[in-house]
């Protein structure tokens, strides 16, 4: 794993909210706004942007932690900006704080953890041969 980032470094990711991001359960639309579980996907992606640059050919990252405080809605067509900030590195685990905003409006805050493992170890853990 390449140690190329330090505490305070940031990655930014933008996503326009689409119909696939709305709060639905078992095909039923609950709310016509960006769902918390779609935010979770994009929180993980935001911090993974660090690992894309850090990983070696024989490595892959896996999620270890995710927390989200959903503060306000984001509607279809709105551009959500995710800012992932390195909070700390513990061995091969990267901890990031994440902030999601539409303009000046805070949509969500949270934290992610991702750990770098050898692909061979992941294959064993997942029962793949």
Predicted regions and their residues:
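Generic structural detector for well-ordered beta-strands
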Residues: 12-18, 69, 113-115
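HotDog/MaoC-like acyl-thioester-processing domains
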Residues: 7, 76, 86-129
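Flexible, active-site-adjacent loop/turn segments at secondary-structure boundaries
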Residues: 20-23, 31-32, 60, 115, ...
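Catalytic strand-loop segment that frames the active site of acyl-thioester-processing enzymes
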Residues: 1-36
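Hydrophobic residues positioned within well-ordered beta-strands of beta-sheet architectures
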Residues: 13, 64-66, 82, 96, ...
């Amino acid at each position: 794993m390449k140690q190329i980032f330090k505490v305070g470094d940031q990655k930014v990711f933008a996503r326009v909210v689409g119909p696939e991001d709305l709060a639905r359960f078992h095909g039923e639309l609950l709310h016509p706004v960006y769902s918390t579980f779609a935010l979770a996907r994009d929180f993980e992606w935001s911090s993974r942007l660090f690992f894309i640059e850090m990983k070696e050919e024989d490595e892959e990252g896996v999620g270890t932690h995710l927390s989200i405080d959903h503060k306000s809605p984001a509607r279809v067509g709105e551009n959500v900006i995710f800012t992932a900030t390195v909070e700390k590195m513990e061995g091969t685990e990267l901890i990031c704080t994440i902030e999601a905003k539409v303009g000046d409006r805070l949509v969500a805050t949270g934290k992610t953890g991702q750990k770098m493992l050898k692909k061979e170890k992941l294959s064993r853990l997942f029962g793949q041969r």
